[in-house]
Amino acid sequence: MSMTDPIADFLTRIRNANMVRHESLEVPASKIKRDIAEILKREGFIRNVEYIDDDKQGIIRVFLKYGKDNQRVISGLKRISKPGLRSYVKADAVPKVLNGLGIAIISTSEGVVTDKEARAKKIGGEVLAYVW
């Protein structure tokens, strides 16, 4: 069975594991999921990312991050550009999430970057998701 939207599936798995406070989760690997996971790690939303080679496409293991008193670090994830309705922005219209408290993940000609990096490089692209 083919998956229509693997990015939405990845974000949903993170959201669900986060809601029940799991320590980690595993998803089938792809380059875009790996790039998104690296951005989430770099921005401090997740603790760590591991890549496991299973002689097929591989597996990405994501270790979730929680604050004091087991508070969630990720309070929300939202898929923006969907297969049925793509969402593109120009360099001067890159969105801010919660006035800069969250991040927008954008797929550009220079790879997958955050909204801050896209503004700094003055490039637009496809808005994949918001994380806050």
Curated annotation (Swiss-Prot):
Key words, A-Z: Ribonucleoprotein, Ribosomal protein, RNA-binding, rRNA-binding
Molecular function in Gene Ontology: rRNA binding; structural constituent of ribosome
Entry-linked InterPro entries: Ribosomal_uS8, Ribosomal_uS8_CS, Ribosomal_uS8_sf
GO BP annotations listed: translation
GO cellular component, one term: ribosome
Pfam families xrefs: Ribosomal_S8
Source organism, top-level taxon: Bacteria
SUPFAM superfamilies: Ribosomal protein S8
Record text on subunit structure and interactions: Part of the 30S ribosomal subunit. Contacts proteins S5 and S12.
PANTHER family xrefs: 40S RIBOSOMAL PROTEIN S15A
Described function: One of the primary rRNA binding proteins, it binds directly to 16S rRNA central domain where it helps coordinate assembly of the platform of the 30S subunit.
Family (UniProt): Belongs to the universal ribosomal protein uS8 family.
Protein name as annotated: Small ribosomal subunit protein uS8
Originating gene: rpsH
